A protein has these predicted regions:
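Extracellular jelly-roll beta-sandwich "head" domains, especially the C-terminal globular C1q domain
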Residues: 1-142
């Protein structure tokens, strides 16, 4: 079986400030990795052949200054969160917080990685590689 695969990764520090719950901010993905039959748009992937895809993502958040902050993150398809990808965490003041997921979902159109605020929060992604988004087609070609 031929697989489609595409990865984006981010390697620079990004800052996010949320003032209320329900705010959405896209994670910037500035480096492309090898791909096959998947388009590369700024900060998103373009799915050319609809089908079932394995989605893997990871976001590394640097320790925050203010305790008891929470955040959600996940993958969006055509601007809407894919529910099965949403992860939620309290942000650590001493260690890196990692939000990650791996699911299989039907994809078409564009996908990206984004935060969904659960309350007020201020955070930075870690230095170096701090976010990845990979999709790989798992359904057979017809």
């Amino acid at each position: 079986m031929v697989k489609q695969r595409k990865t984006h990764l981010a390697v620079f520090i990004q800052t996010f400030v949320f003032t209320t719950s329900g705010q959405i901010e896209q994670v910037q993905l500035n480096n492309f990795m090898p791909s096959f039959d998947v388009g590369t748009n700024p900060n998103e992937l373009q799915i050319f052949i609809p089908g079932e895809y394995e989605i893997n993502y990871m976001i590394r958040i640097a320790p925050v200054e203010t305790p008891d902050q929470t955040i959600s993150a996940g993958v969006r398809q055509n601007g809407s969160f894919i529910d099965s990808t949403l992860q939620y965490s309290t942000l650590s003041t001493t260690d890196v917080t990692v939000l990650q997921g791996s699911v299989i979902e039907f994809l078409s159109g564009t996908v990206d990685l984004a935060f969904l605020s659960t309350d007020t929060a201020a955070l930075n992604l870690t230095p170096l590689t701090n976010a990845t988004l990979t999709v790989e087609r798992v359904s057979p070609f017809r």
